[in-house]
Amino acid sequence: MKILGNIIPHFISSLDGFSRREIISLAYISIEHILGFNKSDCILNNYFVLNSKQINFLKKIVINLKNDMPIQYILGETYFYDLKIKVDKSTLIPRGETEELVKWILEHKFSSVLDIGTGSGCIAISIGHNSDALISALDVSKDALNIAQLNANMNNVNINFICDDIFKYNPKMKYNVIVSNPPYVLNNEKIYMSKNVLDYEPHLALFVNDNEPLIYYKRIIHLANKYLTKSGYLFFEINEFFSKEIINILEEFQFVNIELKKDINGKERMIKAIKK
């Protein structure tokens, strides 16, 4: 693996459990992270000689991939809404579906946003990077907020980060937008999830008790009813199997213009509601 052209064959021969297409994609992601070369650069620099540090890093990547560690955690970063975002095991890996939620939010006019359960800060930071809004972001995890602050600094976005428990927290101001991608995966759904998610991503940010699947939504809707401005927007990412129940709760709190939106995979994944 001393020569650039040998990296992809080495990945292919070393990794099983991935499709060939996935392996090649992982190899290119690793090469770009370590060498800064894109696919075209790889073709033009096929005989580029790697130093020992670069070779050792690539070997480490392969070992960790064989142990089912997500490439984002191995490299310590990913991209979200065209922004580089640092991640570690205290934060969820941002998903493409959440980019769709951000895109939807940015189609509206607003001057203030509260992101509840911010994790890596990807939602708050991408909104802040693409608007002039005043943004606050809440999380119960100090470790996650440390990563979120690094991401805000790295992307030159000013965010007011708050470390608190959503079940105890009460905002000090009203917001035009409240958004949340709260834990919504049931514990009994673990059997359907991949090993790399179960072994590495933070369960606190993923799972809810089977007996209280909507506990976070109920609390956030209650807060939004008090702390959204009139005609303010509430946005959620949701478990596709609980869309009707969440809509019912919103209607109980007299939210209006409730809109359910499917993600790119055709799953009911996002809800928007307006405070009356």
PLM regions and their residue ranges:
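Mobile active-site "lid"/loop adjacent to the S-adenosyl-L-methionine
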Residues: 184-215
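Conserved AdoMet
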Residues: 33-107
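Conserved SAM/SAH cofactor-binding pocket of Class I
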Residues: 96-192, 219
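Class I S-adenosylmethionine-dependent transferase superfamily signal
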Residues: 127, 197, 220-224
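Conserved beta-strand segments of alpha/beta enzyme cores
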Residues: 84, 134, 158-160, 256-259
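A short N-terminal interaction module
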Residues: 1-58
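Active-site beta-alpha loop architecture of Rossmann-like, nucleotide-cofactor-dependent enzymes
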Residues: 72, 185-188, 241
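Conserved Class I SAM-dependent methyltransferase catalytic core
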Residues: 210-274
